[in-house]
A protein has these predicted regions:
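Betabetaalpha-Me/HNH-type nuclease active-site subdomain
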Residues: 62
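Glycine-rich beta-strand-to-loop/alpha-helix junction loops that act as flexible
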Residues: 55-59
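Structured mid-to-C-terminal alpha-helical surface segments
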Residues: 1-53, 65-69, 75, 81-284
Length: 285
């Protein structure tokens, strides 16, 4: 897909326009989907930290596994915490709640410093070499663990942003994962135009994402009344509903060990006073 990224803009526009007509979607969505896939291919095959990342979240459910139909436009990534200087098991060491909170804050600060001072500069250099001044990369003003990529765009749609958000965190679990094949919509319709129509991406299994979303909604069920409900959480209900229509539900429900690992991880690294994670089990969730 790198060859499509570097062809004249008018030729890409024609490709996206024709794909949109065939698929009954807006040109802007076809265009952004291409750049999401291009970024995934870059991150996992050409980026300096290609071996230190894993793909997770809603976009993985749609692009890697075809489990949901909503257009997921952000890329959620796990960064190996060894990149930040931690030993492979160091974050799991026993600590008091107070010391664990201090560790978690320090880990997040290290991640933010790495993204701002090292990762961003490397990505800018690499993408500029491919795309020239047509791409802009910067840290989100409101979230220092998010890198925004303003990709070359020819189409607009009020329902989507003309940028890709790379949401990158080190306090996330790597397993279980598999290598998944990811293909942009344009390559599904016009694969012969692509020298590389798809890309292999190390991706968290949907069964873990299932339990991640179940535990999110379990926590929200106990949210204290004086604490405002977070925005954009309807997606978790939708994603979980769609996964429950597939074998992912049965696979996840049969894997109590995976549920325990998800709960233990959240309780250690994302402790929440009202979440009642101790009550989570198949009989209570």
């Amino acid at each position: 897909m790198r060859n499509i990224a570097t062809i004249p803009a008018r030729d890409r526009e024609a490709l996206f326009r024709n794909t949109a007509a065939k698929m009954g979607m807006s040109e802007a969505i076809i265009e952004k989907d291409f750049w999401v896939c291009y970024m995934l291919d870059y991150l996992f095959h050409r980026c300096a930290w290609k071996d230190n990342l894993a793909f997770k979240g809603g976009t993985s459910l749609s692009k890697a596994y075809g489990l949901i139909e909503r257009f997921s436009e952000d890329i959620d990534l796990i960064l190996d915490w060894r990149v930040l200087g931690y030993g492979i098991n160091e974050p799991w060491e026993q600590r008091s709640n107070t010391k664990q909170d201090i560790f978690n804050k320090e880990a997040n600060t290290r991640a933010e410093d790495f993204l701002r001072d090292t990762f961003l500069h490397s990505v800018v250099a690499d993408l500029t070499a491919d795309l020239g001044d047509n791409v802009k990369c910067f840290i989100d003003d409101n979230d220092p663990q998010t890198v925004k990529i303003a990709y070359p765009n020819s189409f607009s749609d009020m329902s989507i942003l003309q940028e890709i958000r790379l949401e990158i965190g080190a306090l996330a679990a790597w397993t279980p994962v598999k290598v998944a094949d990811i293909t942009p919509y344009a390559a599904q319709e016009y694969g012969r135009l692509f020298k590389q129509p798809s890309t292999d991406i190390l991706t968290v299994l949907p069964e873990r994402t299932f339990w991640e979303k179940v535990t999110i909604l379990h926590r929200e069920a106990f949210r204290e009344e004086d604490r405002p409900f977070p925005t954009r959480y309807s997606r978790h209900y939708y994603d979980l509903y769609r996964m429950m229509q597939t074998e992912v539900k049965d696979n996840a429900l049969a894997d109590n060990d995976l549920l325990t690992k998800v709960v233990d991880f959240k309780d250690k690294f994302y402790r929440c006073p009202w979440a009642r994670y101790d009550q989570i089990g198949r009989a209570h969730v």
